[in-house]
Amino acid sequence: MRGSASERPPGNPVLGCIADDFTGATDLANNLVRAGMRVVLTMDVPPDDERVDADAVVVALKSRTVAASVAVEQSLHACRWLRKHGVGQVYFKICSTFDSTAAGNIGPVIEALMDELDCGFSIATPAFPENGRTVVHGHLFVGDTLLSESGMRHHPLTPMTDANLVRVLQAQLNPGKGRKVGLVEYWTVAQSAEAIRKRMDELQAEGIAIAIVDALSKEDLDRLGEALRDSLFLTASSGLGDSLPRNWGFTPSTRVSLPPARGRKAILAGSCSVATNAQVQRFIREGGEAHALDPLRLAADIECEIARVLAWADACWRSEAALPLLVYSTAEPAGVAAAHAQLGVARSGAIVEQAMSALASAFVKRGVGSLVVAGGETAGICVQALEIRQMQIGPQIDPGVPWCYAASSAATDGGLHIALKSGNFGSPDFFNKAFAFVL
């Protein structure tokens, strides 16, 4: 292995993170901040000559569902920038539901980063027990349900029909490289960091290149984090994020604050997850003002549909300026399937993303100062439309979902409070309570 996590020039960031979507990036940055680190969260790779004053850098990419070759190219670009700026440990942040297909993108990116870093062995775990994601015997559970039996089996872009992560990841690796996937079992993880390190050494000696790691609790992740103290590269969900900073002597902190919130409030929900469906239904059931986007109507005349939504929003805000408004494309699996049947999966998703990005810009230009965006793909396209480059992490709404503050050219005063929610995250009342956390 070339280098180690402890080898870095003085004053440079110790941890460099590559997130495969924007919601996951804010999720990870949130955990690192709460663990005591100073974090720079940047949207895409900064210019080569840009300096950072931080303990950790999180680079947010929109690489989860692009072609594997594009994801690899973007991730390598991020990795090279991070290493150039002195980071000693590289963290590839993936979704806690291991969102991917047989073509990737988790496996191809892991292999490319291992090659780039000359790394002979690494681990991967999507475990995030605080959000109900646990791994046992190499199988991923969402709550008490196998991943393959959860709502993720209906995901329109990355349907997860196999919970065996060893098998899922092995299928994504390049056979020509000969890397094998193994497992660090729960009974080892439950013992100690030293036991985990010993098992990793044994697996590497047996010819294993990547090990899925079981974890059922926060304590399991803490032991794993300690075991990874000198590892150059790792792959994990954001659940592992607050278990790593103590390796450099950081201590937890709850001191987070943002500038005062101003302006109107809006929610854009593009996720079709079970959790976001429930949040939309709860918001509407409790009297919230909401407008549904229909992919078929968007495909027929997107400009007309966007104008219709904006006219509705303007009327609502004339009636009550402080009223939070929800625009959603969220639908049950049957509705999603119907749109896919007529438009195709790619066009159906693209037309909704186009509408959401246009609405994000239009809403902020109309004075929205606090914006919630639900869904990784939706968040990515909206952040790009708003020309956001960096974010400051603020108070947490629910585990994994903080409010952030960002500069945006679309904002009337130059600044915007924004929360990027992974589709699967948040309590059923998330949309109802979110704006109480930003004052």
What spans do the regions from the language model cover?
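N-terminal basic/disordered segments at the start of proteins
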Residues: 8-52, 73-75, 125-130
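Cap/lid and interdomain-hinge subdomains that line or gate substrate/regulatory clefts
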Residues: 11-14, 71, 79-221, 437-439
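Short glycine-rich or small-residue beta-strand-to-loop segments that form or flank ligand, phosphate
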Residues: 14-19, 57-65, 88-99, 214, ...
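General beta-strand structural signal in soluble alpha/beta enzymes
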Residues: 17, 40-42, 90-94, 122-126, ...
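Short acidic, glycine/serine/threonine-rich loops at helix termini
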Residues: 28-30, 102-106, 133-141, 222-227, ...
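Conserved, well-structured core segments that form the ligand-binding/active-site neighborhood
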Residues: 143-312
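C-terminal structural cap/anchor segments
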Residues: 313-374
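Conserved, well-ordered active-site substructure
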Residues: 368-369, 377-426, 430
